[in-house]
């Protein structure tokens, strides 16, 4: 039995996205007074007393989209309604019953799943009585809530759970999914890629740049591996960020990178890299995320152009990420899409790898023998030992006589050596140089300690 789905529907600006965030207890959807902010279906998993359901946020019914995507938005809403086990019909107590509310109810005619009429913005108890006029709609159990004043959240959750399909004893929490952030400039094919992965029209795909405004999570499975793909808003030059939505989108893309286990950095095979690409790659590096450079739309490139040309170009543009794998795909047809995801799973495994202190020091000793550190103030700095202290990213602490004596170039050399000889070949490695403690120094003077180059 699949995880039950609960869809949030209603006219624009009744607080659907606020309700979504409130029930999820975290800010996932963009909340703004501008009509039509939500276009794609957003989902999150909710748990209550061992009962799981997937909550779906949808666009406002009846809004005319400024980018001529109205029919696509409607299709996304219809798909959410069709897949839902329970429907939350959201109305606004403060504005009262509107003709568009009645149109929404008309759209639900013939839908046989349970409907819960959620009267939002009842910020004070005395406003609850104003919700009675919505009973004229004749659909579902009526409950008043306020997302801003945190009124009746638990009651609403219980009403939802009571109307879910009878629980299957075999239904367990979905296994932890590997999170993949899909980032890049606008219109490079990120949403098409997600649709290919999910094998459904999950995202609105259009030639209108900036179609995806939220970061949207899509769960799917490949060869027994569960993934959670996060499709992010496309970024553009900072001086071009003209609206609050673009500001939110930039923030969403950055947060998606922070959430991710692996990042897929998308490029358009027909366009050169830009300042935006470099800023985004810099953000990925800053957060030490494993990354695959994905060159999309490869089918549109002249067949005589070798992939090596793009490889050389990207290596030149992003010299500090020379270890990052590069993939060439056609998201629209699915060419190499599965291979990219399998490679992402390999990177995730590398980032989770842990090596013993003995093996790490054996590798480090070989690096020092091959290339000892340079003299510093008349002395050669000593490296005593190293230990891996964490994963994701693999993090190594090197105990030495003086961290200042080991230059950044030498530290990069050690990282490169570890990458070549340990199971961290294609992922970032964090390296910390730390001065030995007084007790360790005393042990060395007494003959009980030794450096790796001894």
Curated annotation (Swiss-Prot):
InterPro entries: G_ENGA, GTP-bd, GTPase_Der, KH_dom-like, KH_dom-like_a/b, P-loop_NTPase, Small_GTP-bd
Lipid metabolism recorded as keyword: no
SUPFAM superfamilies for this protein: P-loop containing nucleoside triphosphate hydrolases
GO terms, molecular function: GTP binding; ribosome binding
Domain EngA-type G, chain residue ranges per copy: 4-168, 178-352
One of the GO BP terms on file: ribosome biogenesis
Annotated keywords: GTP-binding, Nucleotide-binding, Repeat, Ribosome biogenesis
CDD domains per UniProt: EngA1, EngA2
Transmembrane segments: none
Domain called KH-like: residue spans: 353-437
Pfam families found in the cross-reference section: KH_dom-like, MMR_HSR1
Binding site for GTP 2: 184-191, 231-235, 296-299
Family to which the UniProt record says this protein belongs: Belongs to the TRAFAC class TrmE-Era-EngA-EngB-Septin-like GTPase superfamily. EngA (Der) GTPase family.
Function as written in the Swiss-Prot or TrEMBL entry: GTPase that plays an essential role in the late steps of ribosome biogenesis.
Assembly notes: Associates with the 50S ribosomal subunit.
Protein name: GTPase Der
Source organism of the structure: Rhodopirellula baltica (strain DSM 10527 / NCIMB 13988 / SH1)
């Amino acid at each position: 039995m699949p995880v039950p789905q609960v869809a949030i529907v209603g006219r624009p600006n009744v607080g659907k996205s606020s309700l979504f965030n409130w029930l999820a207890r975290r800010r996932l959807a963009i909340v703004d007074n501008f009509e039509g902010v939500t276009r794609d279906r957003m989902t999150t998993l909710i748990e209550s007393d061992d009962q799981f359901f997937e909550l779906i946020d949808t666009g406002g019914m009846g809004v005319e989209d400024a980018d001529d995507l109205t029919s696509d938005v409607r299709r996304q809403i219809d798909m959410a309604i069709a897949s839902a086990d329970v429907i939350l019909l959201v109305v606004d107590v403060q504005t009262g019953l509107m003709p568009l509310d009645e149109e929404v109810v008309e759209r639900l005619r013939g839908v046989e799943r349970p409907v819960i009429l959620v009267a939002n913005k009842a910020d004070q108890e005395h406003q609850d009585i104003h919700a009675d006029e919505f009973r004229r709609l004749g659909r579902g159990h009526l409950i008043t809530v306020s997302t801003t004043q945190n009124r009746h959240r638990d009651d609403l959750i219980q009403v939802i759970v009571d109307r879910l399909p009878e629980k299957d004893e075999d239904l367990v929490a979905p296994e932890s999914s590997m999170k993949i952030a899909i980032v890049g400039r606008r219109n490079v094919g990120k949403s098409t890629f997600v649709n290919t992965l999910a094998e459904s029209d999950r995202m609105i795909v259009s030639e209108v740049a900036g179609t995806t405004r939220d970061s949207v999570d899509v769960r799917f499975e490949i060869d027994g591996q569960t993934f959670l793909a996060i499709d992010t808003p496309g970024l553009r030059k900072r001086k071009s960020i003209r609206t609050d939505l673009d500001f939110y989108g930039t923030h969403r893309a950055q947060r998606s990178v922070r959430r991710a286990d692996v990042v897929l950095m998308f490029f358009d095979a027909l366009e050169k890299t830009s300042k935006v690409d470099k800023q985004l790659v810099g953000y990925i590096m800053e957060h030490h995320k494993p990354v695959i450079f994905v060159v999309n739309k490869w089918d549109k490139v002249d067949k005589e152009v070798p992939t090596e040309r793009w490889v050389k170009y990207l290596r030149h543009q992003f010299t500090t990420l020379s270890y990052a794998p590069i993939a060439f795909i056609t998201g629209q047809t699915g060419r190499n899409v599965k291979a990219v995801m399998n490679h992402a799973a390999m990177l995730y495994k590398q980032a989770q790898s842990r090596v013993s202190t003995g093996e790490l020091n054996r590798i480090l000793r070989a690096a020092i023998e091959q290339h000892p550190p340079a003299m510093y103030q008349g002395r050669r700095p000593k490296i005593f030992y190293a230990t891996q202290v964490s994963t994701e990213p693999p993090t190594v602490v090197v105990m030495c006589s003086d961290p200042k004596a080991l230059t950044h170039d030498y530290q990069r050399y050690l990282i490169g050596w570890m990458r070549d000889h340990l199971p961290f070949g294609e992922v970032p490695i964090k390296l910390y140089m730390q001065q030995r403690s007084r007790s360790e120094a005393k042990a060395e003077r007494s003959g009980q300690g030794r450096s790796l180059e001894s």
